[in-house]
C-alpha cells in the first residue's frame, strides 16, 4: 500500500471510500458513520470504539490472527472486555475495576503477538521482498517496459499518488485490486527478462526469503 501512495495513510483512504459511499447512498446513517470515523460526532466515545489503543479492530485481529497462526498468546476474552466497558459522565470509554486484569491481558497479548507474529523475521522478510517487487515494477514501467498485469494494477503502478490525486477514478482502481491479483502477477513476473524483478518474485513465491541478521547497537 505504501508503495502506491505517498504520504497517504490507510485511514485517509478509508475516509475517502466512506465519503464516496455517502455520496452514492446518501442518508443520515452514512453521514453519521463518517462523522464518527473523523471524530466529529457529538458522542466522542463512539470514535474510541473504532480508533484507540483498545478498539474493536484490535480485539478482532488479535483473536483472528491467533487462530490462523496458531500463536495462542494472542487469545483475549473480548466478550469480557466489552462487558466491562462503560461510558463515564464526561463521555469517555472507561472500564469497571473488576475488568482491569482482562484489559491487562489484552495489552500483554498484543505485545506478544507483535514479537511472535507481526515482527517475526519471516513476516518482515516477506514484506520487504513484496515492497521491493512493487518498487522495481514501478521503475520498469517508468522506463517504458511492458509488464503483464490487470488494468487497474497497471494504473496504480504508473503513478505514485499524493493525497490530492485520490479521486473517484483512483479509488475505483485501488479497490478493485486484491491479494489474488498480486499473487497472480508475482507468479507471472517470475518469467520476466528483468533479473531483479524475476529474482524477487521467485524468492517470494518459492519462499526463499532473505535471512535476518542481528546487528549490534
Regions found by a protein language model. Give the residues of each.
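Histidine-centered, transition-metal-coordinating active-site segments
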Residues: 2-217
Amino acid at each position: 500500500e505504501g508503495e502506491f501512495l505517498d504520504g497517504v495513510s490507510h485511514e485517509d483512504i478509508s475516509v475517502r471510500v466512506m465519503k464516496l459511499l455517502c455520496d452514492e447512498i446518501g442518508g443520515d446513517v452514512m453521514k453519521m458513520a463518517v462523522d464518527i470515523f473523523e471524530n466529529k460526532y457529538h458522542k466522542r466515545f463512539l470514535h474510541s470504539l473504532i480508533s484507540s489503543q483498545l478498539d474493536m479492530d484490535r480485539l478482532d485481529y488479535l483473536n483472528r490472527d491467533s487462530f490462523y497462526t496458531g500463536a495462542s498468546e494472542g487469545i483475549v476474552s473480548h466478550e469480557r472486555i466489552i462487558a466491562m466497558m462503560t461510558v463515564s459522565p464526561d463521555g469517555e470509554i472507561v472500564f469497571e475495576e473488576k475488568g482491569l486484569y482482562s484489559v491487562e491481558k489484552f495489552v500483554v497479548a498484543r505485545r506478544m503477538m507483535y514479537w511472535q507474529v507481526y515482527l517475526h523475521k519471516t513476516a518482515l522478510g516477506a514484506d520487504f521482498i513484496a515492497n521491493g517487487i512493487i518498487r522495481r515494477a514501478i521503475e520498469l514501467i517508468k522506463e517504458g517496459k511492458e509488464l503483464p498485469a490487470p488494468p487497474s494494477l497497471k494504473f496504480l503502478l504508473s503513478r505514485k499518488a499524493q493525497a490530492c490525486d485520490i479521486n473517484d477514478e483512483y479509488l475505483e482502481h485501488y479497490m478493485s485490486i486484491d491479494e489474488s491479483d498480486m499473487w497472480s502477477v508475482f507468479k507471472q513476473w517470475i518469467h520476466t527478462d528483468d533479473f531483479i524483478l524475476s529474482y524477487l518474485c521467485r524468492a517470494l513465491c518459492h519462499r526463499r526469503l532473505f535471512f535476518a541478521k542481528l546487528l549490534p547497537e
